[in-house]
């Protein structure tokens, strides 16, 4: 059945019960020329483990844009970074909808079958997946709606096209259901004004206005989807895990082990991997009370976690005190060291409590930029600013193998990139790669990456517009009471109701990410959280500024760049036949050379400034000598008059005519169309000058 919905500046067409009918839920969605297929499939048997076994995959098919995959393997292989990040957005938006006790392995797959350069595939894919999930037999309360908000000429724009987004100073992606916001991703988009770089940070008040604008659109969209598809939902006959209330065990813990549990919580505040809970569970299991009542070990563990959560939250709500002794607004102790790696271009060891990030900046040339194929772009996208985030197991005390970056690492690196990128001028001459090695982790490692990254840039001599800092905020909500936490640690992230990361300068927000576990959040609470984050950000920025003033940039190891312009027509002279000339220059002077054929721009990069200057002088002398030779050749060429006759000798026979020698070393072309008899090399023939153009002589028969 086909459903046509006109909502939020989009005309969306949904085909249900047409394709993938074996899946639990499926929908084919079209917007303009873009078509996506979203499917939901689940297993019949529940898993034993206590977690939601949900997998989300987002796949862009090359044929959707009329392309054949590049490389040796001409088919889609593992997903690219952009596909992984899109899958994360869908996952974070839909995961909160699943009912408590749902434990069926579930897979949501979104495939882009046809692309349109103007259609936002992220928004479209989330909405298609939401409808497919709503149509399935998984009992979610209502469909999610995702929207993107831009800001053009200081006006908020709902669901801007891809070309409109290029003129926007804001990129805000929000997902929610009805009047509840579930997921937020925001970034400031820098640009040029009067040839000046502008970061375009968003103020806290403007951020709230943008979220309010998005909330209205989400409510409309969620209601429209519910209205259109409620009658076509599958009946749910699923059973859910019945959680044991473990009241007897909980009471026993509170009466007997509360002191030990408080000590354990204090230890857990210092490490994400503290094993104190496990030790207490083993101790209880061995007691006669547990043996007589046949308490299962997993039930004891669950009861301990219930008590632990209750203790942590009550202490925060009722005493305004946290597990590590901090107040609600306190930031953990910060230590900063810069340029601790002698051979690296720039480095910063940023430590906040038990979270530590070593962030290293490397400067390169244009050839070092990351080239990425984008489905809706004809040419690869060139990224000159990269952030890589690594999270080894030892950072939380685990002996796990180091593997390729996973979804979490890609997501954290992308968040740090969005936070820092506006501070760097897009015209900056170097390619920049930041690598964050998380050496310790107890919450907020992505925000430590932002802080360390901003300082590593300065340590590498990058003149960023402003320093950028980040802080992770948390929320604990109990009935009518709530508490907002600054600089949350792992324990508070796990037992809290909101994960809210805010990064920016003194003047506003450059990036924001929020995942809400409890459903809707009131505007006043969000406002309070934003301003509390601003206060913490200001405190951290002041410490970072003090560290900046002590930075000693190692100029000797930094790459230098010389840029100059030449006649674009002379660029081939620099390249030489088969690239021989430019290769010789690069090898001789130990430099890298980038050429812009359209602008005639020559960019020389290297470590030694003298060698760069010498290579520049060499190139200019080369072009000067080439020009002199051409002028001399032009000067020495005999002068001919139109109609002047010669008795010439055929020097060369080619496919399109013959070359006839007029004077020593000077030939003219007699085209086939003007030849009346077969001519061979050595034949004499009488010709006359017909035309002279660009130093070339065309002949006629005399």
Curated annotation (Swiss-Prot):
* GO terms classed as biological process: mRNA catabolic process; RNA processing
User: Which GO molecular function terms does the record list?
Assistant: 3'-5'-RNA exonuclease activity; magnesium ion binding; polyribonucleotide nucleotidyltransferase activity; RNA binding
Q: Where is the KH domain?
A: 559-619
- From the Swiss-Prot or TrEMBL record, state where the protein is found: Cytoplasm
What is this enzyme's class at the first EC digit? transferase
CDD domains of this UniProt entry? KH-I_PNPase, RNase_PH_PNPase_2
Its UniProt entry gives the catalysed reaction(s) as:
RNA(n+1) + phosphate = RNA(n) + a ribonucleoside 5'-diphosphate
Q: What is its main location?
A: cytoplasm
The cross-references to SMART domains, in alphabetical order and at most eight, read:
KH (SM00322), S1 (SM00316)
CC cofactor: Mg(2+)
Residues binding Mg(2+), per UniProt: 493, 499
Q: Does the keyword GTP-binding apply?
A: no
List cellular component terms (GO): cytosol
Please state the Enzyme Commission number of this protein. Answer: 2.7.7.8
Domain S1 motif as annotated: residue spans: 643-702
- Record's keyword terms, sorted: Cytoplasm, Magnesium, Metal-binding, Nucleotidyltransferase, RNA-binding, Transferase
**Per the similarity annotation, which family is this?**
Belongs to the polyribonucleotide nucleotidyltransferase family.
Q: What does this protein do?
A: Involved in mRNA degradation. Catalyzes the phosphorolysis of single-stranded polyribonucleotides processively in the 3'- to 5'-direction.
Protein name, entry field: Polyribonucleotide nucleotidyltransferase
**Native species:** Campylobacter lari (strain RM2100 / D67 / ATCC BAA-1060)
